[in-house]
Amino acid sequence: MKLHLKIWRQAGPTAEGHFESIDVDDAVPQMSILELLDHVNEGLIEAGKEPFAFASDCREGICGTCGLNVNGRPHGPEKNKPSCHQRLVSYSDGDTLEIEPLRSAAYPVIKDMIVDRSALDRVMQQGGYVSVNAGTAPDADTLHMNHQTAELALDHAACIGCGACVAACPNGAAHLFTGAKLVHLSLMPLGKEERGKRARKMVDEVETNFGPCSLYGECADVCPAGIPLTAVAAINKERARAALSAKDH
């Protein structure tokens, strides 16, 4: 399988980047995008050239480390799949693949296709801590949570923090990410005391450092965890609830 690759090369955050063209003649349809980059890098190293820098870890779709733009789309052409699960079977012999970092004003490029996504970490940091009772662990049956609520919390906790939602959004909004966290945390038995304060701080952080949400829906289309667009509603719901409550909870 022959592919023409245009891969982003950028020495550092302040350096000017450019696409570097490479032709691959022996790509295999079962390869992932990351494995294709591994293959390219092996050839570069053998030739004494600098390999392309990109982020990856588990390659099982659960860590959120990998993240690339492929032909302008976060992760790749297949919906709701991370970069490590995007296979070359989606492409045809002779296709051109333009591979670059996730693009957002909130994600400065560190090198090549590695970006700094710590802006998402700062949203979570604003969530703070949760209060727990000291002493021995309580019996599980004393924490009342029905099955439907637990499933809803787990569905939203599935967010892997890859940041593709922000890169896909024309406004650069992080409302799907933040909404998923707020839904998950609001449903858990622990942390009720801090619910209001948590919502206020997280919403303030996301609206300060990311763009506004216009409900375009591109975020949900690329989310590897399949977080629904309805999660965005938690932003206004939790903010309104916090504004109407005189207490943190």
Predicted feature locations:
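Short strand-turn-strand beta-turns centered on an Asx-Gly dipeptide
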Residues: 8, 25, 70-72
